[in-house]
């Protein structure tokens, strides 16, 4: 029985490695750049005139042939501005019809693309610019003053003017070709920033080979029905439309739409601006969106809107699947979604900036979301039995209580060419199915490392002696920092996080960064920040504050306001509790697990007053 369990999970007891159920596909010897790989996809039979991207707010569309031509024209203009191989281009822009073309143009020259969140404060943006050292910045007119104020020496290229200039060119699209940039698959392509527990974002360097691997992986997973199953009979790549409400300046959105849908040949419907259920569902209906990629707060809002006004019954939807990532999706939200949208499959995927996108995904064919059937890890290390909870009631009763697992909801199966280990954080033991440990992954999409940070790279990427990847992904394993287990079917579950990051509205918030800000307040003696559960946001940052002597007047709203003016909106402190001291180890490290006890003590104290 145990052997059968291991085989079904893709687990090899001899090596301790879990392997994807997909056949290996990555061509390690292919000496291509990402543009050399992706741009020919746009001229495949039947794709030239098909919309690659549609702006749902205006109806404007860009065909695959048009996307290719625009990318190459913009590349020519940027080359004239001095951008070339190895130089960094910062892209500061919200989602738009032209975001992918701007990105592909930069990559076509062998330059490195570093996208930035427009919501960053000037100080936060300055830190990224100082670290990335961009040669030039592609920026919208609205955001240009912010960037000019913090990086006066960086050459600014206004997106609106650039697009107007290349639109005036009259040469034949068919004669356009890639610039001779001499780019290799091991050259740096992307420099996206990932939050860290040190409080400073780290620049994640992904190569052209990483990007190719992710595009090929998504093409296979989505083109095959979602995760290893055969294509549904009615499935047609040419008829697929993906709803784009995710920011493309984050890796989930970038990999999904600049890599995935472009490789698949599917149309991406961009819904610009702040997320709105009304705008999104209108676009889903009007443009026949079949798959929608979201983060959990969007699911919560969709359910609330549907329950409030009968949204699904009034709309004729082709929507088949909603895929959520960025933070755990709670079981209760999945159940409510299913009752509101019974014809739509809701599942999760999992990925990191360090993996250049998605590494696990729920299978559309096999209903991998785990809401109907979930295997919990045994309460002990005894592996002589299989614990299967077949109903929601049983699952709730047997929940492990982990804060990150969404109540036993699967994050899917390993993507093509991805391998994994489950490692005991204390002993380093490699664990079999249904044992909980830290998830390590490797594959051809795993990052090269962190920019100018050898120490962080060495901690994150672990070389395993004598271990060679079967997928051409190298020998280094990425430590994800997440506690997970794999069940007997090969489904992966997140139980908790080893890392201390707060996931607020699917954004990563580093407690140490907020603690540094709080430490500058003249009336605060000591402070710590930890997550506080929130129904809509998942988690919100909450501060534990020790007042300085003589500062009894300090109030919660003053602390919140002080931090709010110094960080991006999603990072701001939402709650404050005043305590006598912050629990720390002898070395001064905050004992974060004990902060919950401080909160309970504070609540109990107030209830007795």
From Swiss-Prot:
Region forming the signal peptide: none
Binding site for (E)-4-coumaroyl-AMP: 252, 256, 326, 348, 353, 361, 499, 503
Keywords linked to the UniProt accession: ATP-binding, Ligase, Magnesium, Nucleotide-binding
GO cellular component: peroxisome
Catalytic EC class: ligase
Purpose of the protein: Carboxylate--CoA ligase that may use 4-coumarate as substrate. Follows a two-step reaction mechanism, wherein the carboxylate substrate first undergoes adenylation by ATP, followed by a thioesterification in the presence of CoA to yield the final CoA thioester.
Domain notes per entry: Both substrate-binding domains (SBD1 and SBD2) are involved in the substrate recognition, and are sufficient to confer the substrate specificity.
Protein name: Putative 4-coumarate--CoA ligase-like 8
Gene designation per UniProt: 4CLL8
């Amino acid at each position: 029985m145990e052997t059968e369990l291991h085989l079904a999970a893709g687990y090899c007891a001899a090596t301790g490695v879990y392997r994807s159920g997909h056949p290996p596909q990555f061509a390690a010897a292919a000496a291509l750049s990402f543009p050399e790989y992706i741009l020919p996809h746009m001229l495949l039979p039947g794709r030239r005139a098909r919309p690659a991207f549609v702006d749902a707010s205006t109806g404007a569309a860009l065909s695959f042939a048009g996307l290719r031509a625009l990318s190459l024209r913009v590349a020519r203009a940027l080359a004239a501005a001095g951008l070339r191989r190895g130089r960094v281009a910062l892209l500061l822009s919200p989602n738009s019809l032209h975001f992918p073309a701007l990105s592909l143009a930069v990559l076509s020259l062998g330059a490195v693309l570093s996208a930035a969140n427009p919501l960053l404060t000037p100080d936060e943006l300055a830190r990224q610019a100082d670290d990335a050292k961009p040669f030039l910045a592609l920026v919208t007119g609205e955001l240009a003053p912010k960037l000019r104020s913090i990086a006066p020496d960086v050459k600014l290229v206004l997106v609106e003017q650039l697009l107007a200039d290349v639109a005036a060119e009259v040469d034949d699209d068919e004669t356009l070709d890639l610039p001779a940039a001499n780019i290799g698959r091991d050259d740096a392509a992307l420099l996206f920033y990932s939050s860290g527990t040190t409080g400073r974002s780290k620049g994640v360097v992904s190569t052209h080979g990483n990007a190719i691997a992710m595009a090929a992986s998504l093409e296979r997973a989505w083109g095959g029905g979602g995760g290893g199953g055969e294509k549904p009979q009615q499935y047609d790549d040419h008829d697929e439309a993906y709803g784009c409400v995710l920011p493309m300046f984050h890796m989930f959105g970038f990999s999904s739409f600049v890599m995935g849908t472009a490789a698949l040949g599917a149309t991406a419907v961009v819904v610009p601006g702040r997320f709105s259920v009304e705008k999104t569902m209108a676009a889903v209906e009007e443009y026949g969106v079949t798959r929608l990629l979201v983060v959990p707060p969007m699911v919560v809002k969709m359910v609330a809107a549907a329950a409030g006004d009968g949204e699904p019954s009034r709309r004729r939807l082709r929507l088949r699947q909603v895929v959520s990532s960025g933070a755990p999706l709670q079981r209760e939200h999945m159940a409510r979604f299913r009752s509101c949208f019974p014809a739509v499959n809701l599942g999760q995927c999992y990925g990191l900036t360090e993996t250049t996108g998605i590494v696990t995904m729920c299978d559309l064919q096999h209903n991998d979301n785990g809401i109907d059937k979930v295997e919990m890890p045994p309460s002990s290390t005894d592996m002589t039995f299989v614990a299967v909870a077949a109903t929601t009631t049983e699952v709730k009763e047997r929940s492990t209580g982990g804060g990150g697992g969404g109540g036993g909801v699967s994050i899917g199966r390993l993507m093509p060419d991805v391998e994994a280990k489950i490692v005991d954080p204390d002993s380093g033991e490699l664990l079999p199915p249904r044992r909980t440990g830290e998830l390590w992954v490797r594959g051809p999409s795993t990052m090269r490392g962190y920019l100018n940070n050898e120490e962080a790279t060495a901690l994150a990427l672990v070389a395993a002696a004598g271990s060679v990847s079967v997928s051409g992904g190298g020998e280094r394993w990425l430590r994800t920092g997440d506690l997970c287990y794999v069940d007997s079917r090969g489904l992966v579950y997140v139980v908790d996080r080893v890392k201390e990051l707060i996931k607020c509205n699917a954004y990563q918030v580093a407690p140490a960064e907020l603690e540094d800000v709080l430490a500058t307040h003249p009336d605060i003696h000591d402070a710590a920040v930890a997550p506080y559960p929130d129904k809509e946001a998942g988690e919100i940052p909450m501060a534990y504050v020790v007042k300085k002597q003589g500062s009894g007047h300090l109030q919660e709203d003053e602390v919140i306001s002080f931090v709010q003016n110094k960080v991006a909106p999603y990072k701001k402190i939402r709650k404050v509790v005043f305590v006598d001291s912050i629990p720390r180890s002898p070395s001064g490290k905050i004992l974060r697990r004990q902060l919950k006890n401080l909160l309970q003590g504070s609540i109990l104290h107030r209830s007795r007053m």
